[in-house]
Amino acid sequence: QFDKETMILHHDKHHATYVANANAALEKHPEIGENLEELLADVSAIPEDIRQALVNNGGGHLNHALFWELLSPEKTEVTSDVASAIDEAFGSFESFKDAFTTAATSRFGSGWAWLVVNKEGKLEVMSTANQDTPISEGKQPILGL
């Protein structure tokens, strides 16, 4: 459970700053477009003078946007399709929770724990530092904390 102050800080300060800074970087190179998922999927193609700003702030925006999208005031159950995929990948839901908790609590400093679909179409748990996004590693995030 999250407290109100933490959510306000992350939404109104952190996320808003990531959006503003990503937009400022994109304004310097309108020719590359504004699709952050496409841009962050090929970081080396981002112009060098804005690359780190987009990795940090574009990643921060995408990470937080997914977090807000998945947040719910009500407890929800895992769908049968997701439960089956988790069982296949991790052996059980408990094993998945253990792996996800380890990814979240073993990250030194700031970062994210993720449930992603990897390049082979399989679920995996991973962690990224700061505002790095799994998209830059060719993985599709489906849960982030």
Swiss-Prot record:
It catalyses: 2 superoxide + 2 H(+) = H2O2 + O2. Keywords: Iron, Manganese, Metal-binding, Oxidoreductase. One of its GO terms (molecular function) is metal ion binding. GO terms for cellular component: cytoplasm. Gene3D superfamilies: Fe,Mn superoxide dismutase (SOD) domain, Iron/manganese superoxide dismutase, C-terminal domain. InterPro entries: Mn/Fe_SOD, Mn/Fe_SOD_C, Mn/Fe_SOD_N, Mn/Fe_SOD_N_sf, SOD_C_sf. Its cofactor is Mn(2+); Fe(3+). Binds 1 Mn(2+) or Fe(3+) ion per subunit. It comes from the Bacteria. Fe(3+) binds at residues 10, 64. The keyword Ligase does not apply. Mn(2+) binds at residues 10, 64. The keyword Oxidoreductase applies. Its EC number is 1.15.1.1. Destroys superoxide anion radicals which are normally produced within the cells and which are toxic to biological systems. Catalyzes the dismutation of superoxide anion radicals into O2 and H2O2 by successive reduction and oxidation of the transition metal ion at the active site. Belongs to the iron/manganese superoxide dismutase family. This is Superoxide dismutase [Mn/Fe]. It comes from Streptococcus porcinus. The gene is sodA.
